[in-house]
Amino acid sequence: YLVGTQPNVVRRIRQQKNGQEYLYFYTEKRYTDAGAWETEKPITQKEYVQYLMEADTALHAVHKTKYRFCIDGQRFEIDVYPFSESRAIMRAELPAAASAPQTPQGIEIIREVTGDPMYKNSRLAREQKL
């Protein structure tokens, strides 16, 4: 996470390992009365290092291993964190008019955390626990 420069805008950078190479991204999330929207763009390693100089020192990098998969056309992501041996966060991409996703076989859903501030990346960056 980067130090805020505008009210209602959260900025962050991300390094993602993809095979033997790294990809870098800059993201802004804007909050308005109508809701929130996020824009993300790829950046160079040099830009990533420059943005690191703007890091919010009250927060930590959120390290995780992300698993992506599809079942019956439904996309899922599971984030596994080194600071939690017993819990992970699963996300399902839902089409606009879709109902709740089917739980993949072999996965136990402990509870629904959509919208729960305790499971937002910004909180994980602050406290490093689930």
Task: Cite the ranges covered by each PLM segment.
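Phosphate-end processing signature that detects enzymes handling 5′-triphosphorylated RNA
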Residues: 1-130
